[in-house]
Amino acid sequence: MGGLTEISFASQYGRALIEGAEGLRKQELKLFGTYTLDGNTVRLFDAERLYYNTSAEKPCWDYDNTQYWISKASYNFCAICPYDAPCTFSDAEGRVILGNYEATTGCPDLLYASAQRDLAENEDFSTVYLNFRHACAAVQFNLVNASNATLIDVRNIRLFGMHNVGTFSFGADGSAGWVFIGSVLNDYSQAYGGACTLPNGGLPVNLNVRHSLYDGGAILVLPQTIYKTGVTLHLEYKKQGDAEYAIRNIELGWLGGSTPTEWKSGEKYEYNLTITDNTITTEVKVVDWVDHYVEL
């Protein structure tokens, strides 16, 4: 092709809530890209679908609208996962904008990436690394039975008191942020309702066994301050021999000690809920949740 170098794709796996490289490949990616030459900016990739081509001689990331590097141009790349995320690219701001994103139980992971390349001073046609980061935070609630009886049922699970709808935007320079839409979830919202399926026969008394409160595991939440707010986890449970369900409202912003004061983008928080005979205690820790890498 007259010495032109194609912009191609490859993948390298890192860990994420999307569990494994296959998760990223199944979701596919949406790419926006521009180049600027002699003061003129041109849209190079406009919501281009990146897919993992397993039929290629060597399986790789691929796309249909082949593009080539242009000497002396400067490039901006922005990408988002999943592909069907309803986002647009603002030429005026040079940012990808995802409006009215609603975080709920079971919503898909949301990842974003950006990169820049300036060929004006250096004719570098090598791989551009896109580091996909998590736009949301993740929380995992686990049950531990330290009581004197088997836990036989958990019901009416819900998380409320925080924002769950917002607009997310990010640019090729790596800047990113959220703007909340509307008020916080109230007690009656089912956005973060959930179910807890216990093992056959119930959850036994065992300090070494942690059972996920939500059947789906970790849930996504918008990054926000929780310290001294009304963010609350509600659940009701019954142990073997109990006449009634125990009703618990755990105020996550008032746990004290060294517990996190905010949920940060790209961080995952594990809340271990230990059920004793008459109460429930909570321990919180930040656990590993790192990112996916895609080579451009």
Locate each region found by the language model.
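Sec-type signal peptide cleavage vicinity
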Residues: 1-296
